[in-house]
Swiss-Prot record:
Name of the protein in question: Succinyl-diaminopimelate desuccinylase
Catalytically driven reaction(s): N-succinyl-(2S,6S)-2,6-diaminopimelate + H2O = (2S,6S)-2,6-diaminopimelate + succinate
EC category name: hydrolase
GO MF annotation list: acetylornithine deacetylase activity; cobalt ion binding; succinyl-diaminopimelate desuccinylase activity; zinc ion binding
Tagged with keyword Ubl conjugation: no
Binding site for Zn(2+) 2: D106, E142, H359
Amino acid sequence: MSDHSPLALAQALIRCPSVTPEEGGALSFLADRLSRAGFSVERPVFSEPGTPDIQNLYARIGTAGPVLVFAGHTDVVPPGETEAWTHGPFSGEVADGFLYGRGAVDMKGGIACMLAATLAFLDRHRPDFGGSIAFLVTGDEEGPAVNGTVKLLDWAKARGERFDHCLLGEPTNPDTLGEMIKIGRRGSLTGRITVHGRQGHVAYPHRAENPIPGLLRLASALTADPLDGGTAHFDASNLEFTTIDVGNPATNVIPASAKAVFNVRFNDDWTADTLGAEIRRRLEAAAGNAVRFSLDLQPSNSPAFLTQPDAFVDRVADAIEAETGRRPALSTTGGTSDARFIKDACPVIEFGLVGRTMHETDERVAVADLDRLTAIYGRVLDAYF
């Protein structure tokens, strides 16, 4: 097996214990392979008070445009109880056609495929392939995500780097390789409602003001009617309550306040501001003069965004269809990713491995999928340049 094969590269990366925020040797391995291939490689470290310093990697080969960026992360979530794994979480063992290890799917396997495809492409097209290839890789995606991609992009912009398109190798396929390309992501908004009452004894309710019925009224106002009916590329926005609490262990005390937390995953019909205004309007209408409440809205750094289907999306879809025989769906489902930052630098889409076992005990990827994803990325490179 060649040490440039996606399997060998993925095994080497998995054997680096890069549990966020630790680098674990993963970025160093990647930097070595890229520099040996002729890339200019830099390793900026970013800091933020109250968070760990994070190592990142930026590499580029070529000086001309267009510039295609491969993006991803080498940090992984903790493995949990290692004794529960059939094969060690950092062993990189292969059994029954599967590569096991933390990050096999999310997303060291994807990075290995990007690297393998790029090395093979350069072997075919050196010295001039009519553009530039860049790697934008962070060690802070599974953690707070404040010293990673968002700062790496600012750092690159300050140096005059400009990108034409980005392919982010997150695991996008629910069950089978080739099912799905992510062309956008929903936004996220968290809200905290506090209904204010007056504490008292349950036997003397006229001396108290129970906040719980008011909170139930407000919660019903937010869930009774849908926020929207969805858009061309997004499902309907969805609001879910995640906790309701009065902090009251006593059975004979009316609490002074009642609190609830909700999260909205919203589509491109809304911004955080317009959605917040609609939520406040519904609450105020339901409360009238009968319910005293306060609302704290916390937008994440995850606005809804969409990369419009274009020639680049078609190139990736064509490559997938050529290797898998299926035309991928263009989707905006799922949670957030670093694409939410990259979208401000250039058009970005996501395509990677099958995500069924990501973050699980015995996370694993089919070795055949590593080979096929490498071939897909190779076809993208051939079509792009």
